[in-house]
Every structure is written in structure tokens, then in C-alpha cells.
A protein has these predicted regions:
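Solvent-exposed, low-complexity, repeat-rich "mucin-like" stalks and linkers
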Residues: 25-66, 113-146, 196-234
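A broadly tuned "polar low-complexity/structure-edge" signature
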Residues: 193-194, 213, 217, 221, ...
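N-terminal membrane-anchoring alpha-helices
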Residues: 5-6, 23-26
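Flexible, low-complexity linkers/stalks enriched in Thr/Pro that connect modular domains
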Residues: 29-31, 108-112, 189-193, 281
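Serine/threonine-rich, repeat-prone extracellular segments and beta-strand-based repeat modules
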Residues: 1-12, 64-105, 144-190, 227-283
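Compositionally biased, intrinsically disordered low-complexity regions enriched in proline and serine
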Residues: 23-24, 80, 92, 110, ...
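Hydrophobic alpha-helical membrane-insertion segments, chiefly the h-region
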Residues: 14-24
């Protein structure tokens, strides 16, 4: 009986030993090491207009078993932007065993600008009708283009309802894919329908100017609509149309300004007037 037990224990010991050897050999054959990166330029300088392929410049990946796996490199993320217009790009590379290696480097967009807001109409509305301000404002980004769907609007004036007849102040906010957030507080006028019975169309409704840039507000007048008839005022305002322009824009002082236009025309002894506001951001 004891001999049988000893024999069984011996067989078990041999089996465990053989399994250990097999596991060791198999385990050693499994590739658990990812590729290694080499980067020629620690800081890559590019333009926002460059294609994404430019981000691959000067970066390679070599695997100890598969060799050159540079073709497997992809951009995993681009995030963050500092005052030097530098962002962090994360790269990932893969070998044939599915191992993944990652590396980060700084990329500087030499012509980067934060997102800018747009207004698709003059922000002057006749009271008595509900409207959604986000239908009339948006934002553009130098990298992503149209990002209007990310714009948020918050009423910051004492008025409680954007549809109420009043001079409102609204803060716009938008964030691009880099995490860069732009904010702008703008005026929104909701007037009594009895005040104005004509409309003014501007060529632009929200503009950005560089400090010291020359500015003539009349250059933005486009059309004056009276009783449904459009009057072209882009080149010159007809003599039978009166123009009032309230302009306090100082391009030497950064800030947000508003130019107010009021146009009037008499038809059959009835005066028809319209109002429009141009928002000017001096950077």
C-alpha cells in the first residue's frame, strides 16, 4: 500500500514538473512587450491648415519581434492648449500580438486662434413672438469649422425671460475639441412691435477687429426693407432714407462694443423705421 502511495506521489511530482516546464516554455514565447517609439522632433510646429498626416512627421515605432510597425501608429487624442499655442498629442502603436505602446509630444499650431462666435442676423427682435437665441448665434473653430451645436447661452442681465421686451445681456460660451473655451457677453434687444415697422439687414452682425484696425460702420449696411420692398444700401444710402448711427467703437481699446443703426423712410406720409445692432469685438 505504501509503495502504491509513493508511486502515485512520484507520478504527481513528475506531472507537476512537466506542466511547469510546459507553462514556462509557452509563457516565454508569448509576446508581452509593445513597440518602442523614436521621436525626432520633441516639439512639432505645424499649421491649423495642415492635414492630420503631418502629425506623424518624425515619429517611428519599432517592435523587438515584428520590426518596424510605424504604419500602425495612430493619433489617439489631441487635447489642451496653452498660451504658447501648444497642445499635447497622444500616439498609439501596435504590434502583431496586440500589444499597445503610447507616447506623447507637444505640437504647436503657429496660426491657432480660439473659437469665435457668429451671429446670423442682427440680434434685434420684435416682441410678442418666442424665439430661441441659439438659432441665431453660432461659433467657428480654426481646426473643426462649424461648432455651433456646442454653444451655450446664459441670460446674465436682470431680465428673467429672453422673450420679454427689454435690453438683455447674454453670455455665450463654447469649447472646442482641445478644451479651449471662449466666452462673449452680447446684447440682445427685444422691442415693442409698435416701435419699428421696417427691417435692416447687415452684411455681418458680429465682427472681430484687431487692435488699431480701421473701422467704418457704414460699410456693413446692406439692405433696408420697407413694406416688403428691399432697398439696396450697400454702396450708398438713398437721399430719402435717413440714417442714425450710434458708434462708440474705439479700436485702440480691446473690448466688446455695439454699433446701433436706425434707418427711416417716409411712404405716403407714414414713417417706416428699422433698427439693427452690429457687435464689434476689439482684440
Amino acid at each position: 500500500m505504501k509503495r502504491i502511495e509513493v508511486l502515485l506521489l512520484g507520478i504527481l511530482a513528475v506531472a507537476v514538473g512537466l506542466f511547469g516546464c510546459y507553462y514556462f516554455l509557452v509563457h516565454e514565447r508569448i509576446d508581452k512587450v509593445g513597440p518602442e517609439f523614436t521621436v525626432e522632433e520633441k516639439l512639432l510646429e505645424i499649421s491649423v491648415k495642415d492635414p492630420e498626416e503631418v502629425l506623424m512627421r518624425g515619429i517611428k515605432a519599432i517592435d523587438d519581434r515584428d520590426g518596424d510597425v510605424t504604419d500602425s501608429i495612430l493619433v489617439e487624442s489631441i487635447y489642451g492648449i496653452n498660451s504658447n499655442q501648444e497642445t499635447t498629442v497622444t500616439y498609439a502603436a501596435f504590434d502583431n500580438a496586440g500589444n499597445v505602446s503610447k507616447i506623447q509630444r507637444q505640437v504647436r499650431y503657429k496660426d491657432y486662434e480660439p473659437p469665435r462666435f457668429e451671429a446670423y442676423t442682427t440680434l434685434c427682435f420684435a416682441g410678442g413672438k418666442k424665439f430661441d437665441l441659439l438659432d441665431y448665434v453660432g461659433a467657428r473653430d480654426v481646426l473643426e469649422g462649424d461648432i455651433r451645436r456646442r454653444v451655450h447661452a446664459t441670460l446674465v442681465s436682470d431680465t428673467e425671460n429672453i422673450n420679454a421686451e427689454a435690453n438683455h445681456e447674454v453670455r455665450l460660451q463654447v469649447t472646442n475639441s482641445l478644451g479651449d473655451t471662449a466666452e462673449l457677453t452680447i446684447p440682445v434687444l427685444v422691442y415693442s412691435p409698435d416701435w419699428y415697422n421696417a427691417s435692416i439687414k447687415l452684411s455681418e452682425n458680429l465682427i472681430y477687429l484687431e487692435r488699431g484696425e480701421r473701422f467704418n460702420p457704414r460699410n456693413y449696411l446692406e439692405t433696408f426693407v420697407v413694406r416688403g420692398d428691399p432697398i439696396d444700401i450697400s454702396a450708398a444710402v438713398p437721399s430719402d432714407v435717413s440714417v442714425e448711427v450710434e458708434n462708440e467703437v474705439d479700436t485702440e481699446v480691446p473690448g466688446v462694443y455695439v454699433v446701433t443703426f436706425i434707418l427711416s423712410k417716409s411712404v405716403n406720409s407714414v414713417t417706416h423705421s428699422g433698427i439693427a445692432k452690429l457687435i464689434v469685438v476689439v482684440e
